[in-house]
C-alpha cells in the first residue's frame, strides 16, 4: 500500500506573497498551520539568488524548519528556454541549467526536483548521473494538455526505462485528469457577457473532440458577439482542457507510478463540500492509495479565479486527507 504524505507547494500562497500580505516566513508558517508535512518551493518565485542558493538562504530555511516543523521536500525548477531575446536556449544550455538546479536543490536539502518538459527526453537522460551524484530525484512535470499516455510523455518513459536510472522520472499534475470545464475560466466568460448556453455549446464541442479550428468556426458568430468566448473556447483545448472520462489516463498513471517522485494536487476551485469541480479526485486518489507510491501529494492551488488562496488551500488539503482516510 502507498505511503502518501500531504504537502503544499508554496505557489498555492503566491498571491498573498506577491501582494505583500505574507513574507516567505509567513508563507511557510501558514503552510504548516494548514497541515502540510512538507512543502515545495518554486525557486524562481521565492529564492532571491535563483538559480543559485546562498548560504544565508539555507540558514533562513533551516531556522523556519526549526520554528514551524516543516522544510522543503521539492525544489521546483523552471526551464526558461525563451530567456534570451534573440534565440532559444540550446539543449546543451538547458542541460547545464538543469544541472545547476540539481546542485541548488541538494544545497537546500531537497531530494526531489520538479523539472519542466521543455527539457527533452535526451536532456533528461544526460542529467541522470548528476541527479544520482547529488541524490536529487528529477521528475518531469506531466501537465495538461499532456497526460501519462500522450506520445510526448511516453518518449520520457522510454528513456527512463532504457537507462534504468532511479533518479529520473515524473511529477504528475492532477489537472491532466480533468473531466469538466474549468470554473474560473467559465465564470470569467460569464462576467464578460457569455451565456450558459454558449459555454455549454463550447464544452460539448470539446467533449465531442471537434478540432479547435472547426470549433472556432462553429462558434464564430457567438464569438463575434462576445469576444471573451473565443479565449474560453481556446483554453478548453489548452492547459485546462478536459475529456468525458479519464479512465485511460488513470491506467497510464498506474504504469508510471514506480517512476513518480511527487504529485501535484492541482485545484482551481474546491467547494464547501470538499469537492474539486473539474478534477475527479474521487477517482484519482484511490489509484494512488492502492499503489506502492511513497511520497507527497502537494496541494497546488492555481489561483485563476481570485478566490481566497488560504481557504482554497485549506479545503484541498482537507479533501485529500479525507479521501486518503487520514
Specify the residue positions occupied by each region the protein language model found:
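Active-site mouth loops of central-metabolism enzymes
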Residues: 9-23, 81-95, 116, 241-244, ...
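Active-site acidic/histidine proton-transfer and metal-coordination neighborhood
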Residues: 29, 63-71, 81-172, 176-222
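Active-site beta-loop-alpha junctions enriched in small/polar residues
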Residues: 9-15, 42-44, 77-80, 118, ...
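Gly/Pro-rich active-site loop or hairpin
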Residues: 15-22, 149-153, 180-294, 307-311
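Charged helix-capping and loop-helix junction motifs
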Residues: 21-25, 53-59, 91-99, 121-125, ...
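C-terminal helical cap(s) of enzyme catalytic domains, especially alpha/beta-barrels
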Residues: 309-326
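Glycine-rich, proline-tolerant flexible connector loops at the mouths of alpha/beta enzymes
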Residues: 38-64, 304
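Hydrophobic faces of well-ordered beta-strands that scaffold small-molecule active sites
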Residues: 4-11, 39-41, 72-77, 113-115, ...
